[in-house]
Amino acid sequence: MKILLIGAKGQLGSQIMHIIKSRKSELGSVPAEVLNAEIIETDVNTLDITNLQMVKESVKINMPDVVINCAAFTNVDGCESSKDLAFKVNALGARNVAIACEEIGAKLIHVSTDYVFSGVGSTPLSEDAITAPVSAYGTTKLLGEEYVRDFCSKYFIVRTAWLYGYFGKNFVYTIMRAGKERGKLTVVNDQKGNPTNAEDLAYHLLKLALTEEYGVYHCTGEGECTWYDFACKIIEYSGIDCEVLPVTSEEYKTPAKRPEYSSLDNMMLRCTIGNDMRVWKDALKVFMDNYKNHIEE
């Protein structure tokens, strides 16, 4: 088995590589076929996914069985001020990878986001819920999903949310750093979603790679909370002496609008390969207990 990992140096790509190199996961045993797979790593410096010819050549030269596309322009506010770039990376980049995969018959695992939804609602959203993004980021990611469907027959579109992990920048590290520096934080308390440990997502992507259970998946931490709730748990588990205060989205203005409610239901996982996603508080606690070891690595 050969896997082409696009975006291997990012938060999720690094977590996938960590599982494979360490030959273990916090969630359980990793299939031998995955551990013994040949992994071709690419990042923004070695593969420009906005260049169709370059993508086609890379895929054709390497002839992977599976392509995992973790590459994206994920700066939500940055997408508002750089809409053309967001479209090139999140939409055309996804299209290019899909076209290349179809040409050689490879499976494509494409990572997407909860921000393809409007935020209207109060119950977890299943994979067939109506999409209606409210930001440039969500719009371009949804276009990417549509291109994947249009141009690749063997696809897994995997939506995740509020991702954090041992590698790279994320909300958990930001809150810890700010908590140490300031001693008092204000965090939005009227947006709900699912904090997701990159370890959990990476583990399930690798499991999907071995199947032909194609389609759209939600893959997020179990349970929902607000960003304020999330921040409070980060401070609690870290032991940092910091006060966390709730504010509204109206009080904390950002260039890009965020969905008020984007909690996802992992229905497809439950009905196909099994849902081993941890409750978000449990996964966060394990992360907080272990993150220093990974930094030292």
Predicted feature locations:
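N-terminal Rossmann NAD(P)H-binding glycine-rich loop of SDR-like oxidoreductase domains
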Residues: 1-26
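NAD(P)H-binding glycine-rich loop region in Rossmannoid oxidoreductase-like domains
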Residues: 49-89
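NAD(P)-cofactor binding segment of oxidoreductase domains
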Residues: 81-109
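NAD(P)-dependent short-chain dehydrogenase/reductase
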Residues: 146-193, 199-200
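Glycine-rich Rossmann NAD(P)(H)-binding loop
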Residues: 187-192, 217-224, 272
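Amphipathic terminal alpha-helices
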Residues: 280-297
